[in-house]
A protein has these predicted regions:
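Disulfide-bonded cysteine motifs in exported proteins
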Residues: 3, 37, 114-115
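Immediate post-signal-peptide N-terminus of mature secreted/exported proteins
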Residues: 21-64, 118-120
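Extracellular/secretory pathway and lumenal proteins
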Residues: 11-12, 46
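Compact alpha-helical subdomains of small soluble proteins
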Residues: 67-121
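Bacterial N-terminal signal peptides that target proteins for export
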Residues: 1-9
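N-terminal signal peptide c-region/cleavage motif recognized by signal peptidases
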Residues: 17-19
Length: 121
């Protein structure tokens, strides 16, 4: 009997449920860019929490320093380039009403975003 890590089992289930090549090339590229941006998005998420906490605790100097770090992440040319490409791909994948044209694209992208969210913790 083969024993898999729970996350591997979930990934295998998604692979089994989704035929190979079922998502569009735009969705594949979107997912690849999400993977590249995952560390930056995780850092931004943590900084947002730290900024909110610093503001609530009235640690103005800390909040200002954290906002500067956040702004520095946004100024990175590679990050900016990738995020602009994501916006273009999102427009192509979207049906104009907030949903994906292809439900399998939405499912694959959503899965990637959930996995990234939980890896960030």
């Amino acid at each position: 009997m083969i024993h898999l890590h729970p996350s591997c089992g979930a990934f295998a289930l998604v692979l089994a449920a989704t035929p190979a090549g079922a998502i569009t090339p735009e969705a594949k590229e979107f997912i690849e860019i999400l993977k590249k941006l995952e560390p930056v998005h995780c850092e931004k998420r943590k900084l947002r929490r730290e900024i909110a906490l610093a503001e609530v605790e009235r640690r103005d100097a800390d909040a200002m320093a954290l906002r500067k770090r956040f702004a520095d992440l946004n100024r990175d040319p590679e990050t900016t380039k990738l995020e602009k490409r994501l916006a273009v791909l999102e427009h192509r994948i979207s049906d104009g009403r907030g949903s994906a044209r292809d439900p399998e694209d939405l499912q694959a992208i959503s899965f990637q975003q959930r996995e990234a969210f939980y890896r960030c913790e």
